């Protein structure tokens, strides 16, 4: 049995900790929603061939558009395919780095396990 006043170890101090944890969770949830909206609106540019091919994606890697210069078209199908692939990879890398950076900003200082 527990001594007087010890109860189940869930006193006022623990209630404050629990309330603070819920508050932090709500802040993260609100921040994540705002972040998702920001990421959807972003336009991140990936390029290849010195700008001959440009791929624009959102901050959450959704393709928005592809721009191909006439000079790239003149290079032939195989090279054009390589340029488009390289530009897509460039855009993807930049977009995921941006997403990761924004997530770190969102969770910094919250003392969340695993972040």
Curated annotation (Swiss-Prot):
Major location (coarse): cytoplasm
Record's keyword terms, sorted: Cytoplasm, DNA-binding
Localisation per UniProt entry: Cytoplasm, Nucleoid
Gene3D superfamilies: Nucleoid-associated protein YbaB-like domain
Domain of life: Bacteria
Pfam families xrefs: YbaB_DNA_bd
Keyword Zinc (UniProt): no
Presence of the UniProt keyword Cytoplasm in the record: yes
GO cellular component: bacterial nucleoid; cytosol
GO molecular function term, any single one: DNA binding
Family, similarity comment: Belongs to the YbaB/EbfC family.
HAMAP family membership: DNA_YbaB_EbfC
Function, as annotated: Binds to DNA and alters its conformation. May be involved in regulation of gene expression, nucleoid organization and DNA protection.
Subunit text: Homodimer.
Protein name: Nucleoid-associated protein Ava_2322
Organism: Trichormus variabilis (strain ATCC 29413 / PCC 7937) (Anabaena variabilis)
């Amino acid at each position: 049995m527990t001594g007087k006043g010890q109860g189940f170890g869930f006193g006022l101090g623990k209630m404050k900790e629990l309330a603070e944890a819920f508050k932090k969770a709500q802040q993260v949830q609100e921040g994540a929603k705002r972040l998702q909206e920001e990421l959807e609106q972003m336009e991140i540019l990936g390029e290849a061939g010195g700008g001959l091919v440009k791929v624009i994606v959102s901050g959450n890697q959704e393709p928005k558009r592809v721009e191909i210069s006439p000079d790239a078209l003149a290079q032939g199908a195989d090279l054009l395919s390589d340029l488009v692939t390289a530009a897509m990879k460039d855009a993807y890398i930049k977009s995921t780095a941006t997403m990761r950076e924004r997530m770190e900003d969102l969770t910094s200082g919250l003392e969340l396990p695993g972040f």
